[in-house]
């Protein structure tokens, strides 16, 4: 669990911003959202496979030469 020590004469919103940034860096909120409901192992594998296919197709699209515009 990330923690932030509030420095002397530091505004609360600055400390809160540092805390939010540390939580985001650790990935706590994304893990919490993923564990909110039970996901069957087959559904998890299917979701991860679909994400991998999407990433691969996106990578291939970015590597292709753009069409000639004339």
UniProtKB/Swiss-Prot annotation:
Q: Which domain of life is it from?
A: Bacteria
Q: What residues form the membrane-spanning segments?
A: none
**Which InterPro entries did the record assign?**
Ribosomal_bS21, Ribosomal_bS21_CS, Ribosomal_bS21_sf
UniProt KW keywords: Ribonucleoprotein, Ribosomal protein
Which PANTHER family does this entry report, sorted A to Z?
MITOCHONDRIAL 28S RIBOSOMAL PROTEIN S21 (PTHR21109), SMALL RIBOSOMAL SUBUNIT PROTEIN BS21 (PTHR21109:SF22)
Q: Which family does it belong to?
A: Belongs to the bacterial ribosomal protein bS21 family.
What name is this protein filed under? Small ribosomal subunit protein bS21
In the UniProt record, the gene name given for this protein reads rpsU
């Amino acid at each position: 669990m990330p923690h932030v020590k509030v420095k002397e004469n530091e505004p609360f919103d600055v400390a809160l911003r540092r805390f939010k940034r540390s939580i985001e860096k650790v990935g706590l909120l994304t893990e919490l959202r993923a564990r909110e409901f039970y996901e069957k192992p087959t559904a998890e594998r299917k979701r991860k496979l679909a994400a991998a296919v999407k990433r691969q197709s996106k990578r291939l699209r970015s590597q292709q030469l753009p069409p000639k515009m004339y």
